């Protein structure tokens, strides 16, 4: 029943928020282990660009779904251990050339938040698509891990890239772009846009 599901989700959300608030006030720190953006001052252009950022997030989500199905169908045809060897070789060779796509993306996102100006906007957008492709390849071919942090990293990278293409390196614009693209991407992949 849909109404009971909504009620249960509401209770879970309230309980999670309450427990988080209680533990944060008791022990301090909150989400200190996870990189967070600084507060931004939004301008009129940011509101106009929301549509562009949403389209960027949807493009990544569409690419995620395509590569998820494609890598899954290819992985079914590759014998057991060879699929993991192929995934490891692909990841190793590509990350030798582009180290930003290695690992889950949790630590790399924090680093990217401080070094994004060293990249061309097109490179950041390319890294986002490559991260999505490699994540699906590794998961479908049997390597351990999940898609949550790699998808967040890809969204941040794509948001930075799009914002830099349009607004330059301005910190406020790129932070807003990264947040909107990432929220759109996660909402589309999880199929729960209001949960993000």
Question: Language-model segments: which ranges?
Answer:
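Alpha-helical transmembrane segments and immediately membrane-proximal extracytoplasmic
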Residues: 1-196
